[in-house]
């Protein structure tokens, strides 16, 4: 067996990530027609199109059919309308009812969605993280709203890890370099080791995903292609540096009760 292509790692040093690009947003449509449209403030914090919501519905069916919805411990979303709409639409629960004791993941019609409220009942936690924002260039579609505007729209999403009320990252005249996006992506992956969750869905953006995955030369041929809208790819990350603190939860020490257990091959070597 070629050790160069096959690796063996302890399970508790691994996490499974389900990477998702947001569904079609209004900026995708207008930008396809005319690239200069990306500079329009009419596309500020772009929301999903009706077609985008259809894409969300189809990915949701796929996630449920393959049992992923029952495995995921945490959902992370970039704090923009299109990513949060995609995240709650795919991984949330349908049929929210007032008075059930759990706030909705999304209220009805949030972000011009014309979509019913989405329940958080029996869902994993949802958190918003700035590190997985889109490649920050000069497009208003990538500028976020204030956190106080988002909270009433997405009551069950946790925004507590976002330090600034207003968007201090996006600037109208400064472009984030490709390498800066990749460094931010690696910082995000390293941050995941501070979390105890083992199976995580991440709803983010094409540019962020491309430049982050492009840093991993061993998977370039298979993974370093631009994501389609609402595409999902699953990967495993490994804590080779043993920076995480998680103990092995499924390992079992054996010898309970204690007894003699000299292996036969060791016994052979002693004779």
Model-derived features: positions:
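Acidic, His/Gly-rich catalytic cores of divalent-metal-dependent hydrolytic chemistry
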Residues: 247-271
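Short alpha-helix plus adjacent loop in nuclease-associated cores
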Residues: 111, 133-143
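Short glycine/proline- and acidic residue-enriched helix-loop micro-motifs
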Residues: 42-46, 133, 158-177
């Amino acid at each position: 067996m070629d050790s160069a292509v096959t690796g063996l790692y302890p399970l508790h040093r691994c996490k499974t990530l389900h990477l998702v690009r947001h569904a079609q947003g209004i900026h995708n449509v207008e930008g396809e027609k005319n690239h200069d449209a990306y500079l329009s403030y009419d596309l500020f914090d772009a929301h999903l199109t009706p077609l985008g919501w259809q894409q969300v519905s189809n990915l949701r069916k796929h996630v449920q059919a393959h049992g992923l919805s029952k495995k995921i411990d945490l959902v992370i979303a970039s704090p923009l309308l299109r990513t949060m709409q995609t995240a709650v639409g795919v991984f949330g629960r349908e049929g929210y009812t007032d008075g059930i004791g759990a706030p909705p993941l999304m209220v009805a019609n949030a972000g011009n969605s014309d979509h019913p409220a989405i329940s958080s009942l029996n869902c994993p936690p949802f958190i918003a993280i700035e590190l997985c924002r889109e490649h920050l260039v000069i497009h208003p579609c990538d500028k976020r709203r204030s956190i106080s505007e988002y909270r009433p729209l997405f009551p069950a999403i946790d925004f507590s890890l976002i330090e600034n009320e207003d968007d201090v990252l996006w600037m109208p005249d400064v472009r984030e370099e490709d390498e800066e996006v990749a460094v931010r992506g690696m910082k995000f992956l390293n941050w995941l080791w501070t979390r105890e969750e083992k199976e995580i869905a991440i709803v983010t953006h094409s540019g962020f995903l491309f430049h982050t995955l492009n840093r991993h030369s061993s998977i370039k041929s298979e993974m370093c292609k631009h994501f389609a809208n609402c595409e999902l790819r699953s990967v495993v990350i490994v804590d080779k540096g043993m920076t995480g603190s998680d103990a092995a939860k499924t390992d079992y020490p054996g010898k309970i009760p204690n007894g003699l257990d000299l292996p036969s091959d060791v016994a052979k070597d002693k004779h």
